[in-house]
Regions:
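Catalytic-core regions of hydrolytic enzymes
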Residues: 1-110
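Sec-exported extracytoplasmic/periplasmic mature domains
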Residues: 34-45, 68-72, 80, 115-124, ...
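Active-site-adjacent mobile loop/cap segments within catalytic or ligand-binding domains
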Residues: 77-84, 93, 126-188
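Active-site-adjacent substrate-binding region
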Residues: 105-130
Length: 188
């Protein structure tokens, strides 16, 4: 394969992640990743490894280790945000001190490519790119890594809209990944 990605559905199993308005983050992230898988499965150019495809909880270390073991070109973690009930919007997290891909792609550049696709799919407020150097998966994954926060589960209307559009977000995950590989080929 010329392109290798690790796709991570945040939380899972005993770790529900954010819970609000009758929804659980772990279920939403899993459905998004499962939807993305249906697109990746039809693409012979990209090999995708998944940290989970069911309601299990891989540790944060296991998630990073998977990417490191398979020599991934990209690590893509999908999450749902939570804050006060009025918080709104889509943001994508990168690590300015994180590793680059083998071709020199930074966490910032990878995040900057995918963010508009996710934001466009949600239609939510654009919270932009946020530098987070302390997150385990963005710190220990030895390639270009990103973590996208689709929207706020703590916001009632946003949670409801997310729940009915998870498949669309999965498609955006796929399309944004394709765009990144077009823009920054792997050299494999």
């Amino acid at each position: 394969y010329k392109q290798i990605v690790v796709l991570d559905a945040g939380h899972g199993g005993s770790d529900s992640g954010a819970v609000a308005n009758g929804y659980k983050e772990k279920n939403m992230t899993l459905k998004i990743v499962q939807a993305a898988k249906s697109y990746f499965d039809d693409d012979p150019d990209i090999k995708v490894y998944y940290t989970r495809l069911s309601d299990t909880y891989p540790s944060l270390t296991e998630r990073s280790d998977l990417a490191n073991e398979v020599d991934a070109d990209r690590f893509y973690s999908v999450h749902i945000n939570s804050a006060g009930s009025s918080a709104t919007g889509t943001e994508t997290l990168y690590n300015s001190k994180g590793y680059k891909s083998s071709t020199g792609l930074t966490s910032y550049s990878w995040s900057a490519t995918i963010h508009p696709y996710i934001r466009s799919a949600t239609g939510f407020t654009n919270r932009g790119l946020v530098n987070r150097t302390g997150l385990a998966v963005l710190r220990h994954t030895k390639t270009s890594s990103t973590l996208t926060e689709i929207g706020f589960i703590s916001n009632k209307s946003e949670a409801k809209k997310m729940n009915s559009n998870l498949t669309n977000y999965g498609k955006a995950v796929y399309n944004s990944t394709k765009a990144s590989f077009s823009k920054n080929p792997t050299g494999r």
